[in-house]
């Protein structure tokens, strides 16, 4: 509960639009204390998963939230993921959406918050965890920056998951580039909306996400705000 009020304070401090704040408040109770539900989903999805630290399963905290919000969505076939780490999110999306395929973009070199992380091992774990999907052409790995990927990309996607470089400038670029290749009716899933790593709160992902929502509100048919933000394009 304390974290909830801290998040509210920070959102107000950075000038978050009231309709976004009210959306976050509305989603508080449905997503409060759902760790047991997420844990059950985690146990069902991940088998023989290799990780550099089994206590750092950030994506797994959102498993129930994502499962509930995409429960009735069936038309997701082409998925793009910006930031893949060890493969948890990619595996979830492939298992949640039948007959889908995913493009995974990551440098596997980390960013500001990853000073002490062994990314050679992280990448090795990703390759192990996703080997079945790679060998069956369900997952394509792109070891490059998201900027380089978008320069070469000529595909459009039904769902795009953004969890790459968390600096505000790069988040802004990733949002614009992702929106341009997202199909009408497609979904943009934005991770770490409540990530407050930088002391200047406006340098964290929430600020560019807020600005993006305001600028594109007329082309957004559905908005769900929690620790992850889900946007459906009109």
Q: Where are these predicted regions, by residue range?
A:
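Membrane-proximal basic amphipathic "stem/tether" segments
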Residues: 1-54
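N-terminal pre-P-loop "Q-motif" helix
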Residues: 62
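S-adenosylmethionine/decaboxylated-SAM
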Residues: 49-57, 67-234
